[in-house]
Amino acid sequence: MTKVNIGIVGCLGKQGKRLVAEISASPNAQVSAGLVRPGNPYVGQVLGEIVGCNCSAKAIDSLEHLFDVSDIVVEFTNPQTLLECIKMAESKKKPLLSGTTGPAATEMVFEDYIKNIPFLWTTNVSFGVNILAKLVEEAARKLFDYDIEVWEMHHRYKKDSPSGTSLILGRAAAKGRNVPFKKAQYVSGTPQEARQDVNTIGYAVSRGGSDLSDHRIMFVSDEEMIDFNHRTLNKNLYAKGALKAALWLVKQPPGVYTMSDMMAAAE
């Protein structure tokens, strides 16, 4: 069976290294190349020797070449690089999977950019988180008069706030309540007047330690609190989820997809 050639943008970041190792261990895929910035001292070196796995692909500094040698490209970087990848993917007509987070990525309307390729963007490739989002949507619909609060704990280096995962849960709750997401949120710590009604979704953010990822969403009434929790025990779950998503996406027709689309197709 022919293996799917997967190119990785940002291959030497934390997530990139996990992806290199996970893909290299797969019977269905292989790393075609990994992109690093021009001038990086690892350009031309074998990724397996850098990461410590069985991978013969090399680190390169040409985005165009990465797309040329890949069946699909995966990127977990930043919004500016994501835009560059979208333009190149459209030019080369190659599928693109993005896990880039942050406000700029969250506000992008990908349908304005994607015309000729299958494209999947998500702020969390964990199957558990995306299943939780479905449960949250249903809970928000049924518990229509409960207050909703989202809390997260991440490592001290986490830049975006609230995190992409918190926003996934918030969007799910807003969808369950049938209210616009942007109007249904405030960040805890602002004046209490910010909570205008039960459809306002609150966010509380904590930072500390070096390798934490914990999310809770609470539905609170005067009489009870229902608490959903997702805790990451091993960050390899993101690499596993990204590989599964890439192997699914490469077979899809052009369009903008979500993790929900992939999970629905598997039902």
UniProtKB/Swiss-Prot annotation:
Metabolic or biological pathway, per its Swiss-Prot or TrEMBL entry: Amino-acid biosynthesis; L-lysine biosynthesis via DAP pathway; (S)-tetrahydrodipicolinate from L-aspartate: step 4/4
Pfam annotation, one family: DapB_N
PROSITE patterns: DAPB
GO cellular component term, pick one: cytoplasm
SUPFAM superfamilies: Glyceraldehyde-3-phosphate dehydrogenase-like, C-terminal domain, NAD(P)-binding Rossmann-fold domains
Keyword Oxidoreductase: yes
Molecular function terms, GO-annotated: 4-hydroxy-tetrahydrodipicolinate reductase; NAD binding; NADP binding; oxidoreductase activity, acting on CH or CH2 groups, NAD or NADP as acceptor
Residues at the active site: H154 (proton donor/acceptor), K158 (proton donor)
Binding site for NAD(+): G10, C11, L12, G13, K14, Q15, G99, T100, T101, T122, T123, N124, V125
Residue sites binding (S)-2,3,4,5-tetrahydrodipicolinate per the record: H155, G164, T165
Protein purpose: Catalyzes the conversion of 4-hydroxy-tetrahydrodipicolinate (HTPA) to tetrahydrodipicolinate.
Protein name per Swiss-Prot or TrEMBL: 4-hydroxy-tetrahydrodipicolinate reductase
Originating gene: dapB
